[in-house]
């Protein structure tokens, strides 16, 4: 099975280990990975900021880059959600509507792909300790991926997963929201960190680097002793 990896901007610039872990997990599950070097941003920051025409140019480039893929997989629920928004963005454009739908139909977040397409619930990972998981807004509410991460984490040997209090609450990142509405964003992430600390977990796990950078940055500034891990890194662990 051929998988075309959309690595995302944040993974490319800040969390390269997440990209490496994603590739290693998928290869271990029998996938052949392709990486189009022409890939750029999915267009979400510009689109959410109201720069629709600029965003469309990025989206068109991504459609051209990925439309011949068998499966498109990304370690980001948020960016996968943006791919699924492409048909809406181009619904009135006869040249791009069908091509946008074609790309959206074969785009998956990593855990969604493993559980729903590969039909795998145990990737053979092991990690000792306790963990809690932040469920990102775009991934759960817009993409509709709610169960797959928990299913995979429940089968990580040595790992005990504790429910995060107020798990439905946003961490305050929201892309450009954290820049435009900084005081509100700071209050939200403080509340999220309080919830994480309440669990007493060794690890905070998430499936979106934006959320993890936001929460992890706050945890570090506050001097808390919690390790922040992307779920791809957890699924690639053998400890």
From Swiss-Prot:
Any one of the GO BP annotations: lactate metabolic process
Pfam families: CCG
CC terms in the record's Gene Ontology section: cytosol
Gene Ontology MF term list: oxidoreductase activity
Superkingdom per UniProt: Bacteria
Assigned protein family: Belongs to the LutA/YkgE family.
Annotated function: Is involved in L-lactate degradation and allows cells to grow with lactate as the sole carbon source.
PANTHER family membership: LACTATE UTILIZATION PROTEIN A (PTHR30296:SF0), UNCHARACTERIZED PROTEIN YKGE (PTHR30296)
Name by which UniProt lists this protein: Lactate utilization protein A
């Amino acid at each position: 099975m051929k998988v075309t990896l959309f690595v995302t901007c944040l993974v490319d610039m800040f969390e390269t280990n997440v990209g490496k872990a994603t590739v290693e997990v998928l290869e271990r599950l029998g996938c052949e990975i392709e990486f189009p070097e022409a890939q750029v941003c999915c267009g979400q920051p510009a689109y959410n900021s109201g720069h629709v025409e600029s965003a469309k140019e990025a989206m068109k480039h991504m459609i051209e880059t990925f439309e011949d893929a068998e499966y498109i997989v990304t370690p980001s629920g948020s960016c996968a959600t943006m791919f699924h928004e492409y048909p809406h963005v181009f619904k009135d454009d006869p040249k791009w509507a069908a091509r946008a739908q074609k790309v959206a139909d074969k785009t998956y977040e990593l855990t969604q792909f493993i559980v729903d397409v590969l039909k795998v619930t145990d990737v053979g990972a092991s990690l000792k300790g306790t963990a809690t998981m932040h469920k990102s807004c775009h991934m759960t509410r817009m993409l509709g991926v709610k169960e797959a991460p928990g299913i995979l984490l429940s089968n990580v040997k040595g790992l005990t997963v504790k429910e995060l209090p107020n798990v439905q609450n946003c961490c305050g990142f929201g892309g450009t929201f954290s820049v435009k509405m900084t005081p509100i964003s700071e209050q939200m992430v403080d509340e999220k960190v309080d919830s994480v600390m309440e669990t007493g977990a060794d690890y905070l796990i998430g499936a979106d680097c934006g959320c993890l950078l936001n929460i992890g940055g706050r945890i570090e500034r506050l001097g808390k002793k919690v390790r922040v891990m992307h779920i791809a890194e957890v699924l690639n662990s053998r400890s």
